[in-house]
Amino acid sequence: MNKKTLKDIDVKGKVVFCRVDFNVPMKDGEVTDDTRIRAALPTIKHLADQGAKVLLASHLGRPKGEVVEELRLTPVAARLGELLGKEVKKADEAYGDAVKAQISEMKDGDVLVLENVRFYPGEEKNDPELAKAFAELADVYVNDAFGAAHRAHASTAGIAEHLPAVAGFLMEKELDVLGKAVSNPDRPFTAIIGGAKVKDKIGVIESLLDKVDNLIIGGGLAYTFVKALGYEVGKSLLEEDKIELAKSFMDRAKEKGVNFYMPEDVLVADDFSNDANVKIVPISEIPSDLEAIDIGTKTRETYADVIKNSKLVVWNGPMGVFEIDLFAQGTKAVAEALAEAKDTYSVIGGGDSAAAVEKFGLADKMSHISTGGGASLEFMEGKELPGVAALNDK
């Protein structure tokens, strides 16, 4: 990686503004899943141990530039304190004189969580004045929020113009793992692309067709490809305006010698619930009054075989509606194949795929689970991420 990291700077006695991704699920004022907080611990501990005064900035939810009481970061600061085993203070603002006064009382190694940066309308607009106000608090900027790296916001991009700016450990690991997958993958290299819509994955499919040996398609977006082969898809998800594009993707795969895998059979249902009547049919026989909601048993076996014979697998998007147990078997089969594959390095591209491996209790069997859904997709597409571009070069 050609960006400066924590290893390139001395932070002793300095105030460090560290952008983290604490956008965690909450219920009744409690953090229900602290995965993202735990992911930032190595960077936070390193900064504190090295004698920095650590300011932590994050967004939470979508307050749209105004104060929303239930989106304050107070419960997050409390949970972080439990994980660190020490007191973590919380500011009521993210910049300004009151925050500066709190910072002046900090000792080396202390941690202060700033208020939700999205309470300020300037954050998402990358307002230069707000970026400057953030920068005035600190001596050094560290970005450890890979999950927000594809956004050019005041706390992810603008602030870096005013301070020495380096990547935290989590950001560094994400860029190293995904960077190797994109530029120098172990082969056979397989990408699994699922999810609901073709339109959300156009860029990543286009980019991966130049890099992979095998491309596996699943989820709702698969039925546009099924239709492109000339089959009827019943009531399944279908993007009529993307059928020609699906055809061109299949043609390009053939030209490039990429093995293109799509469902051979599917699970069809008469309802979107655990009580639905279901059956498995070949893709050539999807009934007109039913909807395909998951991949079938034959397809699961084929996909599992491809996975187990791959050296590197990148997975982005589920095979079916895994939130409903009846329609979770395809996604589970992929997760289990990855968990069982001995010589396969598995990269889970955040978002729904990460939620799925968590749900099936297989997260610890994956080589790398990305903390950024949108960011990892854009990185795989070959786009420059503003939060990374803003950091100092080595």
UniProtKB/Swiss-Prot annotation:
Residues involved in ATP binding: 201, 323, 350-353
Gene Ontology annotations for the cellular component aspect, listed alphabetically: cytosol
Pathway given in the UniProt record: Carbohydrate degradation; glycolysis; pyruvate from D-glyceraldehyde 3-phosphate: step 2/5
MF annotations from Gene Ontology: ADP binding; ATP binding; phosphoglycerate kinase activity
Phosphothreonine: residues carrying this PTM: 299
Stored InterPro entries: Phosphoglycerate_kinase, Phosphoglycerate_kinase_CS, Phosphoglycerate_kinase_N, Phosphoglycerate_kinase_sf
Catalytic activity: (2R)-3-phosphoglycerate + ATP = (2R)-3-phospho-glyceroyl phosphate + ADP
Domain of life: Bacteria
Subcellular location per the Swiss-Prot or TrEMBL entry: Cytoplasm
PANTHER family named among the record's database cross-references: PHOSPHOGLYCERATE KINASE, PHOSPHOGLYCERATE KINASE 1, CHLOROPLASTIC-RELATED
Family the UniProt entry places it in: Belongs to the phosphoglycerate kinase family.
Name of the protein described by the UniProt record: Phosphoglycerate kinase
Organism name: Bacillus subtilis (strain 168)
Gene: pgk
